[in-house]
């Protein structure tokens, strides 16, 4: 539990207590001040007094005792904006219709952009009503920022841009996400029902999970129809009757035969001209048809792009969405089980990805189709690190930014998957371990054999011992998933490094001859922070270099 008083604060483990013990007794036992019996306090957001007994309070794991209630975020009804990328993320902020919402570097902005690449007043957002569709949309305007603002890779024009669906905006080094409606549904908060267990936990009922979004359907590419060339002019059919007529005139001495003979070449020439004209008309008609089909093809590609970005967001939600799930808490909390196909998939950033949908007939596409597929780009799409088969994410860069990304990855692991399906362990150099003390609050860190112990090690000797223990006894872990954080330049050095062995466990699983055993084996994912790329272990399947 946590004490958050002005004159006394800290984190403590409560091993045992008597039912008649009061909150005042508990605070005094930690070395805190003696409080009057009637002093109002809060256990999380529940009002109590210093004289309230623990039997009445029913202490919960992670409880916070303070003079102010713990605030929970609320879902924004209607359009909202949040920082979803960069070194900081925020909770959703409502977009007003009465005035423009200001995003910029100014400390007085509605959304403060923590980057030097943003202008003092960089972006304006305002909800507007569309009379033609009777819907609410958002007007995006750039009041003359230095570096501009970008949507789908295009700079927002001077006259602004109106959007009607979820939109990602690049503003300097930051990413803003606009949402037309809340994407989450709040679950009952722990302690809101009389179901607190003797161990200080409350049951969390996961509703049935909807199926994962499937990949976009295959796209039918347009093909040109073959317009047959007109037959070549037949000289024999035109000249033959003339020669025959000349012979008949010479033999029969009758000029009328010449007049009849002339009809045949006239008909031949007329038919040839008509076929040429029809061929030209068919070519124009086919060209127009193909151009129209290409426009429809581009629309289908754009729809597939939106569907694929939506699928990637579902597979790897952005840090702001993950944070909201944890703080609400949301019904989507801990929805990934050990058998889920998206176990151990992580959102590492936002970027532009070359991607093309599958074609119904992939062989020999038209050159125009091939050009579109080769240059198709998913703008502002989630960058996904897939560690379902093992491996690690290596992070290299400035300490502050590297820690921010690593914390984001840990938050994702702890939010997507519950402690019944995922164990999280941390090993760090002694000088870096203080940056990870906060993780001891995660239930995923508890050792099954001793709930008072955590999978946390500081220094090389202690870390090597814990990592070797995890590697040797990995199949006896109560959870199928294991996420290991290694914050060190020395723990992954040497051929005898237990950290290397543990992070490479996925390779051992893939080489198992018994496929049934491999399917039920533990899944190990790593998050490794290092000072340079050459210090990362070979098991890193994704590397993030922060400039």
Regions found by a protein language model. Give the residues of each.
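Accessory regions of macromolecular translocation/handling assemblies
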Residues: 1-19, 25-36, 46, 52, ...
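Major-groove recognition helix of helix-turn-helix-like DNA-binding domains
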Residues: 40-41
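Intrinsically disordered, low-complexity Pro/Gly/Ser/Thr-rich segments with frequent PxxP/GP/PP motifs
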Residues: 64-66
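Long, compositionally biased intrinsically disordered regions
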Residues: 57-60
